[in-house]
Amino acid sequence: MKTVFVLNGPNLNALGKREPGIYGGKTLAAIADDCKQAGASLGLGIDFRQSNHEGDLVDWIQEAGDKAAGIVINPGAYSHTSIAIHDAIRSIAPLPVAEVHLSNIHARESFRHVSMVAPVAVGMICGFGPLGYTLALQALAARL
């Protein structure tokens, strides 16, 4: 069975409590369950992780380069600032990476409109809440 790493960046551990008007009321644990269920239906193993630390995300991206068939990543605010995450994803090409955001980053503050991840991802899904993770898994499964 192919494995997809689902990586989550800073503050996503606070989902369910943090700004539910923007991010919804679902917890990250519930999103992990959704991903595992979707993965099972797609024939994919899911390795679901979260960290508030950029270096952890870089380490996991590099690990995925050796162990995974693809990555779904919600880098959180690091989307807009992290050249390190951009470079880590670039270094594991052609491993497919799908970027996910719960909110529509293009309908929010202007500093959120640019993603450092998008140029090295196969695609981005934003604005569909937790469903975005399932959509990203479906999109990756179609490419694998």
UniProtKB/Swiss-Prot annotation:
Residue positions binding substrate: 74, 80, 87, 102-103, 112
Molecular function, one GO term: 3-dehydroquinate dehydratase activity
Pfam families, per the entry: DHquinase_II
Active site residues according to the UniProt entry: 23, 101
Enzyme Commission code(s) on record: 4.2.1.10
Site (Transition state stabilizer): 18
Entry keyword set: Amino-acid biosynthesis, Aromatic amino acid biosynthesis, Lyase
Highest taxon of the lineage: Bacteria
GO BP term, example: aromatic amino acid family biosynthetic process
Root EC class: lyase
Similarity comment: Belongs to the type-II 3-dehydroquinase family.
Name the UniProt record assigns to this protein: 3-dehydroquinate dehydratase
